[in-house]
Amino acid sequence: MHTLYCYVDGSDNQTVEPVLVDAFRALVSDWAQYRAVLVNHQHERTPDMAPDDLSDWFIGLNLPLPHVSRSLIDQLVLFTKALAGVTARDFVVGISSPSGGSEDLVFLNANADASEGSRLYTKLEATLHGA
């Protein structure tokens, strides 16, 4: 099953982790009927990383695609816009496939507007239907 993801874009999240996690936890709770899942996963450091390199850190949510609607997309855009304003972070929304592949569809920030929801929904539909 394909999954929609929405994660903070970047790995320098130490100072804003509590705000991000609390906000996404609340949204996941509101979207429990859609089987939304909170994600807060920081990858282990690897030997090839320089001392000042940050390991990948995914903070956000996953949502099974059968449950994604235009209304949820619009809510997600408003949510990320507000959270970007509070945290000064951008967000990436994309789709992952059961085979493990993923495709980033849009990047959202504090300036996101209703057109971003339309663009995201159009890209989502095109990706799912092979257009």
What role is predicted for each listed range?
Residues 24-35, 81-88:
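A common structural junction motif
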Residues 18-20, 40, 92:
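Generic alpha-helix signal with a bias toward terminal, lower-confidence helices
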Residues 43-131:
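Charged interaction segments
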Residues 1-6, 41-44, 94:
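Short N-terminal secondary-structure initiator segments
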Residues 30-46:
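Short, glycine- and small/hydrophobic-rich beta-strand elements in well-ordered beta-sheets
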Residues 1-32:
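Short, extreme N-terminal segment that most often corresponds to the first beta-strand
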